[in-house]
Design a protein with these regions (language model features):
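Short, low-complexity interaction segments enriched in Ser/Thr/Pro/Gly
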Residues: 1-2, 22
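Bacterial N-terminal signal peptides
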Residues: 11-21
Length: 373
């Protein structure tokens, strides 16, 4: 007599088989030096110094100023050709969505979807980020920030050993922030100070601003409600971000577990991520060096699972060398424990602003006088 399988068992087995197929290569490495910059002709001249620096760092850089003007389908074709003929590791889109279009899905754009270049899974086959600007001057500001950061052109490197954990109290925020704080403090070889800012605190905006401008921080792990123009639970607006003055105190990496803060497609000015990236001036850039933000609504449980992976695991894995790979690894690790739908939303909606090839600063360099890494 054949024994009938329990329907629940079959359902669970099916879920794990689907997850295995879709996320089977989630531990793949992002080794390689091929970089493709996609932009328009109006930004080409401003990119010269930046490209020369990337080449000096050992990257094989190609500049494409034609594909963007022809639309997302042509961009996808270019990326596929590049990947198929010699590989591709870093994709940097330079310009706002009106300059360099994104893959448009149901109700939101998805730059990460450009990286699905091999197989039928949901594992990106290259790293991607966007330097979102509207003018050559805005681009020069952000590129000067990248150059200053990568070359280590700082008089003081204390900011490397400082971190911020900022969290709402709901959606498991108290427990999440506590675990991050405990984990980071358990690495005194990396951190002297871990600043925890909670939704229940007073003067939250000032605390965030002071941590960036006065203390100087390596990264901000943020978990809370968000909007297109602000962190909502721990209030910090695009106006607050645009007015930051932290040229001398390092540029933080921001991992934003929040809805809509990376909505670069809105029509009423900059989203919060863009404001953080555009802060300062050409002579004195400020704000963040990178910002991971949602293009639309996000799944808080999935986001904080990825954030734990980033700042409790991969940050301390020194084989993970770049900001892009750090966030990529964290997202994929979280996806392995999600259903297909939740994993796909997390992957397609989370956008990295900045340069995905920028190396991480983990330790204060032995020589602190304008080092070139």
């Amino acid at each position: 007599m054949k024994q009938k399988k329990c329907p629940f068992f079959l359902l669970v087995l099916g879920y794990f088989l689907i997850a295995f197929v879709i996320f089977a290569n989630a531990d793949q490495s992002m080794a390689g030096n091929k970089m493709l910059i996609i932009t328009t002709s109006k930004y080409a001249k401003v990119l010269n110094k930046y490209i020369n620096w990337k080449i000096k760092r050992g990257l094989d850089v190609e500049l494409d100023i034609l594909s963007a003007e022809k639309g997302a389908e042509i961009i996808q074709r270019k990326l596929q050709e590049k990947y198929d003929h010699g590989g591709l590791t870093y994709i940097v889109l330079v310009g706002d969505i009106d300059d360099v279009p994104s893959v448009m899905l149901a109700g939101y754009p998805s730059d990460p979807s450009y990286t699905l270049l091999e197989g039928n899974d949901l594992i990106g086959d290259a790293l991607i980020s966007r330097i979102s600007v509207n003018t050559p001057a805005e681009l020069e500001n952000q590129l000067n920030k990248v150059l200053k950061y990568e070359k280590g052109d700082f008089e003081n490197f204390d900011w490397i050993r400082h971190a911020v954990v900022a969290s709402m109290t709901g959606f498991d925020g108290v427990d999440h922030a506590g675990k991050l704080e405990t984990s980071l403090k358990s690495h005194p070889d990396y951190f002297d100070e871990v600043i925890k800012i909670m939704e229940s605190d007073s003067n939250i905006t000032k605390k965030i601003r002071d941590s960036i401008e006065k203390t100087g921080v390596n990264f901000i792990a943020h978990h809370g409600h968000g909007s297109t123009t602000a962190f909502a639970s721990l209030h910090f607006s695009r106006e607050n971000a645009a007015n930051l003055k932290n040229f001398d105190t390092g540029f933080p990496i921001i991992h934003g577990a929040a809805c809509s803060t990376g909505s670069f497609w809105i029509e009423d000015g900059d989203c919060l991520a863009e404001a953080f990236m555009k802060a300062g001036t050409v002579e004195k850039p400020a704000g963040a060096i990178a910002f991971l933000g949602g293009a639309t609504s996000m799944d808080p449980g999935a986001c904080i699972a990825a954030q734990k992976e980033v700042f409790m695991n991969y940050y301390f894995d020194e084989d993970v060398e770049t900001i892009g790979e750090l966030f990529y690894k964290g997202t994929l690790a979280a996806m392995k424990n999600l259903s297909e739908d939740r994993g796909e939303r997390l992957f397609r909606r989370w956008h990295l602003f900045g340069d995905c090839s920028t190396p991480l600063w983990r330790k204060i360099p032995a020589k602190t006088s304008k080092n070139e890494r």
